[in-house]
A protein has these predicted regions:
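Membrane-anchoring/interfacial helices and their immediately flanking loops
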Residues: 1-37
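Intrinsically disordered, low-complexity sequence elements enriched in Ser/Thr/Gly/Pro
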Residues: 1-4, 82, 384, 391
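Membrane-embedded alpha-helical segments of integral membrane proteins
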Residues: 22-73
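Cytoplasmic membrane-interface regions of multi-pass membrane proteins
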Residues: 71-81
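Internal/C-terminal transmembrane anchor helices
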Residues: 81-104
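Hydrophobic alpha-helical transmembrane segments in integral membrane proteins
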Residues: 99-117
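Non-catalytic, solvent-exposed segments at the cell envelope interface
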Residues: 115-116, 120-123, 128-131, 137-518
Length: 518
């Protein structure tokens, strides 16, 4: 054998005296890489706590077996170069898979920590002037007369007013009894500026005659108060066996956080029985005319959220005679990113319709909005995020308006669940989790969510999802949040449908399959 061939032989196989060649060292490095990745994976998964005891034991055994087999091949000085190289490549592939899984586990835990924060109890109060007013800052309003609400939201109004007066002295004010009176006073030049809770802009936008209030005015100052977060709920050790009820609330506020004290445009009770794998979704029209639990006066259900998410929960508890255990608050605009990250969703519409022009987020992610109209066919529609947002918002195209919108919103929820449960999510799970982190807030403890994930991994059974949307009679009446100046569009509850919903809820809680009696 020539010297050159002997040197090449020794490089790959090692010398006859037992030194290692390149193939040996490559194999050992691959083994070390897989060993480190195995430890990281095990630490991440055990830290997440999402696996059952049986699955944890299986994972440990698999990791020990894989590392043991590769050590058996790579540790001895052998001349089987092909075997060492093949095992080394396999080890690197497995290491990459472990890194992917470890990253996914870390992203999942970060996501759970973010969404279980409960949302923000922050309240933002604005100083508003007419659009043609020369004032650009609050200091420019020296000498202005400020309009304020006499009773509604008085605590936040007084806090903002006190803050303003600390900077420029006493402010002259004029009180008004209702929100529409306050808006009229500003637009008709009875006052120069008004102090208005940020949540009331959406109320005025949805009130006939005031839809253009935001365009006719401008905000020159914002004052925020960070109120104490709601008391955390203790984890429920029996969450995977006992039924529970979640209030799913959707908000369309244009803020960079998930508010707990704003209108709720979607009101769905999710009744979940883990033992029977039954889920019942009960949708209540946003304009349902109900008594406010804390005030005794009647208002639209959507306005209940202005007084805090607990007010909405109490109202639905009274309506359906059931205890609500948790809430999940969803920011509609943020769901655009979730659906786009999923690659779109499929919804099966029972009607064909065209939406009116509505504001949707710009595609460049700038946070700005533009008007757009969409068309949907009867049957299956594949929707991107903006189309899904329009599909879930539209109500003017239907004779039964808000009731059909509620049904469409449940279709979007089902579409998201179906797509999220498919293998397609693996390609973009990080984008989905990142978008969802900014769009969802719940007071369900992280430990309870993990317990439910464990339960699902243990039996892998499917879930039976039943939906029920309530309807009512379109009418007009006074609303507490708007005052007694005029009657506003409301939906009077259909008592028979309310009774049916109550019965369906109790069926699920009793462990039965929900069935609507004819």
């Amino acid at each position: 054998m020539s010297r050159r061939r002997r040197n090449a032989y020794s490089s790959y196989y090692g010398s006859r005296g037992g030194s290692r060649g390149l193939a040996d060292w490559f194999g050992l490095l691959a083994l070390l890489c897989m060993l480190v990745c195995s430890v990281i994976l095990l630490v991440r998964v055990l830290g997440a706590g999402v696996l059952t005891t049986a699955l944890t034991v299986v994972l440990i055994l698999v990791l020990v077996l894989l590392n043991g087999l590769h050590a058996f091949v790579q540790l001895p000085v052998r001349r089987n170069v092909a075997g060492k190289l093949i095992c080394a490549v396999v080890a690197l592939v497995l290491s990459a898979a472990m890194i992917f899984t470890s990253t996914a586990a870390g992203s999942l835990m970060k996501f759970l920590s973010n969404i279980t924060s409960g949302g923000s109890a922050k309240t933002t109060t604005c100083v508003v002037v007419r659009a043609d007013d020369p004032a650009e800052t609050v200091n420019d309003t020296f000498g202005y007369t400020y309009g304020i609400l006499e009773t509604l939201d008085r605590e936040n109004t007084d806090a903002a007013l006190s803050h303003i007066e600390d900077g420029m002295g006493q402010v002259k004010t004029a009180g008004f009894g209702t929100l529409t009176q306050l808006a009229d006073a500003l637009l008709n030049r009875q006052v120069d500026a008004v102090i208005l809770n940020n949540s009331y802009f959406s109320v005025l936008k949805g009130t006939e005659g005031y839809q253009s209030f935001s365009k006719d005015t401008k905000v020159i100052y914002r004052f925020s108060i960070d109120k104490a977060d709601p008391e955390p709920i203790a984890p429920n050790a029996n969450i995977s066996r006992e039924p529970f009820v979640v209030y799913c609330s959707g908000t369309d506020e244009r803020v960079d956080y998930i508010p707990l004290n704003s209108r709720s445009d979607t009101n769905i009770l999710a009744v979940v029985n883990p033992s029977t794998h039954q889920i019942l979704l009960v949708s209540t029209p946003r304009d349902y005319y109900l008594p406010l639990p804390s005030y005794g006066q009647k208002d639209k259900l959507t306005h209940f959220g202005l007084y805090g998410i607990e007010e909405s929960i109490k109202g639905l508890e009274q309506l359906y005679n059931v205890d609500v255990n948790y809430y999940a608050r969803v920011h509609f605009a943020g769901l655009v990113g979730v659906i786009d990250a999923l690659g779109g969703i499929d919804v099966n519409s029972d009607v064909a319709f065209n939406t009116v022009g509505m504001e949707v987020p710009d595609e460049d992610g700038s946070g700005n909005f533009h008007f757009a109209a969409y068309s949907f066919q009867k049957g299956v529609n594949h929707l991107d995020g903006r189309q899904a947002l329009a599909f879930a918002r539209e109500r003017d195209a239907f004779d039964d308006g808000d009731m059909q919108r509620g049904r469409n919103q449940m279709l979007v929820v089902q579409g998201i669940v179906n797509k999220a449960a498919s293998p397609a999510i693996l390609k973009s799970y990080q984008d989905v989790l990142a978008a969802a982190s900014d769009s969802i807030a719940t007071n369900m403890p992280k430990e309870d969510i993990i317990s439910l994930v464990k339960m699902q991994l243990q039996d892998m059974s499917g879930w039976n999802i039943t939906t029920y949307g309530l309807a009512g009679e379109n009418s007009a009446d006074y609303c507490y949040s708007l005052g007694n100046d005029a009657r506003y569009a409301v939906v009077r509850p259909n008592e028979q449908m309310v009774a049916t919903a109550q019965d369906l809820i109790q069926q699920v809680l009793r462990g039965e399959t929900p069935t609507v009696n004819p």
